[in-house]
């Protein structure tokens, strides 16, 4: 047992930090774009302004400098605190998780849409969906809004909860959680700058997310499968995910849809004429029934069951030290 003792202690600290961060976030949720977020965005713009000279390798350099600096400072502080007090190092982990992980960063959008659909207030549901996606939803019907809300929630739960949790559990200290969220943010800020006018500056930011998110995407999908209808989730994952516009996030969406037995994807319509005009041609993923307000509750249940599953796995490792 002495050989595995460091891993058991690490699992205990990880589990307790995750529980504390989730509880803190429920009591005092952070705004989506608070002062810390605005400061970080300004810092990334500063790095881009000084390192983007129109070449692909400048994007590589900017990404490595940004990630390397953040990880060096955070991990250095963690190990320095660990020499002083385990409690201080644990508190730093809780703080980093509080800043990088949480349901409340996206759940208010989902909950408000769920309430609007349940009340039959389509106009309010459209307005809320448009605000969440950053695109007009004025022509969408209730079924399309339900599908989009479920898709957005499954994607956000991966990016804000499971991806962070998995990387935090993989690397000691706060480095994994910070690396994951930073990679997503760099893709958001720089990933679209791949054209000739930018010299391919954003290519590496996109590639880095593919590498960093490869395992978490599949573990999130596996968690959904175990927490829901396993057979349908695996079937949809294997047969539908690759045909989604982004095959990687398609893994999470297909598995999640199969797990709760709902059909997602499918074209969105502008509502002109009896059948409408397709404005966003998307393949159908999932299996079972058409999406409606009731399936939004099923989505919440699936995400929470999957989270409990991962926490139980960490708890088993932690308890192993006493057996």
Predicted regions and their residues:
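Hydrophobic N-terminal alpha-helices or hydrophobic patches in metabolic proteins across all domains
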Residues: 2-323
